[in-house]
């Protein structure tokens, strides 16, 4: 459905901000898709993060939902909940599902802001 060249372009960061005027946090995007964003170093609600592998791309939704693809593992994951959480980005519950998927695939750590194998 989607060629390798297009997947490669979808995986590359096309834009990063120190402050996104809509989300009010630092963000990273690739052709309209969100990339891994590590804002754990910020305090309070500004610490909203979405920790994926470097090649992964997708988007979070209000209340904690997420959908993404990870070309290097041939994995895709979608999560919606029956009760919205607080905030605009991925919440702890959603991130824990992402973390479990990467750990099951043998990835070791997301300490550097992206899942690393």
Task: Briefly describe each language-model feature range.
Residues 1-117:
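Catalytic loop of the DD-peptidase/beta-lactamase superfamily, centered on the K-T-G motif
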């Amino acid at each position: 459905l989607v060629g390798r060249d297009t997947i490669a372009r979808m995986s590359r960061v096309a834009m990063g901000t120190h402050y996104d005027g809509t989300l009010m946090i630092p963000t990273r995007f690739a052709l309209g898709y969100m990339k891994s964003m590590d804002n754990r170093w910020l305090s309070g609600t500004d610490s909203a993060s979405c920790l994926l592998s470097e090649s992964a791309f997708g988007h979070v939704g209000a209340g904690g939902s997420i959908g993404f693809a990870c070309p290097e593992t041939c994995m895709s994951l979608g999560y919606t909940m029956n009760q919205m959480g607080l905030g605009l980005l991925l919440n702890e519950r959603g991130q824990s599902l992402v973390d479990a998927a990467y750990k099951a695939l043998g990835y070791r750590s997301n300490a550097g802001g992206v899942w690393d194998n």
